[in-house]
């Protein structure tokens, strides 16, 4: 096996991209290094950057769809191969890039027969589609498909109410996460006194891994800047004051309960097929090499949402089963 060799600075802290690849329009990869770091610094920066990459970068998604021909989400429309639910799921997968602030409107107006793809979406000039070939629907007859869309820029993911809006439109649970995955690793040298931080970033194509790295860094810096203004820590808020009631602090009670339960059971020996999961969820987990309860607990809610065909409802069902049977919770984000 040939060992990889890279050139790093000996004194000045520097970063650089050591590898980049485009698997498709909707999957970009970048590998970066930061060095030289003192012992322990790489892990501190790596953990913070991973959290910022996955949770602090805004993305643009379709969040609502409206059509006069739709009676309910699970209906079928004559002349359209897909069900309404399948069309909504296809719209959820559309990757957008924008300079949008807040929300805006878009639309689809197509006459069949033929395929409806992302390129058929009529967008405002400040929103663009990353992959025009993404499939939306198949029209098998000469009918007209008209859909109004709401587009929103935000971060994280939102769970919208399952009911329709008052205007008859249907919510789409958006995942505003342009970074699909991020990992960090550490290489030690000089007898363990110096470290190199490696950051791997996969994006959905709405921004490059390098752009994601820059934006996550800016957002992380913005979060820390208030700590530099020590003279303003008791600044009067005047009309902007807001009193927040604090709940009882039960962290240690929950931790003790979790530790006690973990000691009573061998997590490796509890297989997920023993936990009342529906076959579809079980198969999704199995395809991601999750076979035991321990495998499942090594993932966060965000990790599950990135699995193919996984939905918000599936995550909620898993959380309910973990709480009911094992008194265990699954974190939203992985530290």
Swiss-Prot record:
Protein's UniProt keywords contain Nucleotide-binding: no
GO biological process, one term: DNA-templated transcription
Gene Ontology cellular component terms for the protein in this record: chloroplast; DNA-directed RNA polymerase complex; mitochondrion
Catalytic activity line of the entry: RNA(n) + a ribonucleoside 5'-triphosphate = RNA(n+1) + diphosphate
Keywords: Chloroplast, DNA-directed RNA polymerase, Nucleotidyltransferase, Plastid, Transcription, Transferase
Gene3D superfamilies linked: 5' to 3' exonuclease, C-terminal subdomain, DNA-directed RNA polymerase, insert domain, RNA polymerase, RBP11-like subunit
Any one GO molecular function term: DNA-directed RNA polymerase activity
InterPro entries recorded: DNA-dir_RNA_pol_insert (IPR011262), DNA-dir_RNA_pol_RpoA/D/Rpb3 (IPR011263), DNA-dir_RpoA (IPR011773), RBP11-like (IPR036603), RNAP_asu_C (IPR011260), RNApol_insert_sf (IPR036643)
Broad EC category: transferase
Region span, Alpha N-terminal domain (alpha-NTD): 1-231
Region of interest (Alpha C-terminal domain (alpha-CTD)), residue spans: 263-335
The protein's Enzyme Commission number: 2.7.7.6
Subcellular location(s) per record: Plastid, Chloroplast
Pfam families: RNA_pol_A_bac, RNA_pol_A_CTD, RNA_pol_L
Protein family membership: Belongs to the RNA polymerase alpha chain family.
NCBIfam families hit by this protein: rpoA
Domain comment in the entry: The N-terminal domain is essential for RNAP assembly and basal transcription, whereas the C-terminal domain is involved in interaction with transcriptional regulators and with upstream promoter elements.
Function (record text): DNA-dependent RNA polymerase catalyzes the transcription of DNA into RNA using the four ribonucleoside triphosphates as substrates.
HAMAP family per UniProt: RNApol_bact_RpoA
Subunit structure, interactors included: In plastids the minimal PEP RNA polymerase catalytic core is composed of four subunits: alpha, beta, beta', and beta''. When a (nuclear-encoded) sigma factor is associated with the core the holoenzyme is formed, which can initiate transcription.
Entry protein name: DNA-directed RNA polymerase subunit alpha
Provenance organism: Helianthus annuus
Primary gene name: rpoA
């Amino acid at each position: 096996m040939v060992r990889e060799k890279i050139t790093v600075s000996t004194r000045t802290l520097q970063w650089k991209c050591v590898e980049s690849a485009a698997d498709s329009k909707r999957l970009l990869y970048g590998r970066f290094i930061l060095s030289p770091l003192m012992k322990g610094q790489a892990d501190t920066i790596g953990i913070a950057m991973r959290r910022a990459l996955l949770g602090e970068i805004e993305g643009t998604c379709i969040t609502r769809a409206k059509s006069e021909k739709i009676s309910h989400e699970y209906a079928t429309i004559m002349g359209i191969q897909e069900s309404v639910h399948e069309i909504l799921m296809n719209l959820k997968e559309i990757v957008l890039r924008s300079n949008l602030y807040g929300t805006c409107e878009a639309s689809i107006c197509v006459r069949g027969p033929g395929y409806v793809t992302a390129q058929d979406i009529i967008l405002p000039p400040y929103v663009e589609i990353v992959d025009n070939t993404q499939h939306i629907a198949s029209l098998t007859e000469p009918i007209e498909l008209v859909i109004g869309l709401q587009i929103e820029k935000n971060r994280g993911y939102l769970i919208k109410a399952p009911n329709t809006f008052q205007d008859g439109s249907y919510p789409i649970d958006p995942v505003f996460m342009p970074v699909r995955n991020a990992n960090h690793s550490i290489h030690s040298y000089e007898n363990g006194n110096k470290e190199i931080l490696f950051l791997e970033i996969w994006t959905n194509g709405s921004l490059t891994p390098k752009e994601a790295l820059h934006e996550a860094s800016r957002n992380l810096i913005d979060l820390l800047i208030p700590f530099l203004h020590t003279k303003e820590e008791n600044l009067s808020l005047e009309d902007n004051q807001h009193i927040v009631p604090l709940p009882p602090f039960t962290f240690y009670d929950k931790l003790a309960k979790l530790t006690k339960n973990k000691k009573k059971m061998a997590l490796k020996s509890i297989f997920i097929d023993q936990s009342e999961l529906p076959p579809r969820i079980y198969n999704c987990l199995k395809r991601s090499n999750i076979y035991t309860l321990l495998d499942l607990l090594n993932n966060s809610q965000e990790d599950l949402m990135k699995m193919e065909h996984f939905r918000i409802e599936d995550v909620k069902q898993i959380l309910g089963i973990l709480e009911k049977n094992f008194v265990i919770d699954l974190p939203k984000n992985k530290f």
